Amino acid sequence: MTNNAKAISTFCSHLCVAKDVRPLEPSEWSALAAKMLEIGVAPENLLSFSAQDFIEILGETPESAQRMTRLLERSASLAFEIADYEAKGIHIITRADDEYPKQLKEKLKRSCPPLFYCAGDMSILHRKAVGYVGSRKVSPEDAKFAVDTVSKTVGNQYAVVSGGAKGVDT
């Protein structure tokens, strides 16, 4: 994992977070990333920032600076947690990674998630994809329709994407 990816994970991951500290939401990370780009600060630079640096260099409020430093405090435990995930075949991909889907960045721009967790064949992240969502309660006919539709989608060389919530799509 690159230092830029470590920084994004440190500020945006929900792993190893204290109950009284929230990781940055995608919109918050996007706003911070825009500030950093404007003044030439790379995400990895944040790993050595103090609360005062967040205030003076990035113009953060004292409350926000405290939140950022609290998120930084978990970097060691987060590194162990990420290593555990990696050992189980679960990977974290951040906006800073080459593996991050270009289509996602192009379509969503600043709204794209700063990171996501994935497992399996990462090459599908760069294929055309169709997303499916559906109700939890479906009739047998609806379930068959979903299976047939997904089979045709896969047969046409599209990846199938699901949000993972319980429903006909999972």
Model-derived segments and spans:
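Short, positively charged patches
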Residues: 1-144
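Structural motif
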Residues: 163-164
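Short active-site oxyanion
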Residues: 89-91, 157-160
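Acidic/glycine-enriched connector segments
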Residues: 102, 147-158, 167-170
